[in-house]
Amino acid sequence: MKNVCSARTWFPKKAQYWVKQPLELIHTDICGPITPESFSSKRYFITFIDDFSRKTWVYFLKQKSEAFEVFKKFKVMVEKATDKQIKFVRSDRGGEYTSTTFMKYCKEKGIRRFLRALYTPQQNGVAERKNRTILDMVRSMLKSKKMPKEF
């Protein structure tokens, strides 16, 4: 007999939603702290990925607390460029995404949020994978330029 308590829940490989246009669903995540920090003292980056096109925007942050202001600027920029509105945001449960200020802002703007369950990065796989891809690309570029390993 199998011990049910020790089994992990299965996560579907395919998304359970289908977007039909740009900005319908934005995946986001913060990566960091990264060492060494940049010359401008930035230790984190935040990614925004459009589920429809997979277009990705990356912003560098000194602190995670900058995420809300960056999101607001990102929202204005992409909505103006596409003449569409962000409808859903999928993220982890980091404090920058669960703050009262962020929740209130999303509610005012009509943005629904999908927050993944705790300790389940699989549920935010698009953003998690994109962060890993970006870090792999950076490491590859640094290695090809024969930069010291501390970079």
Language model regions located:
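Anionic group-binding determinants
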Residues: 1-151
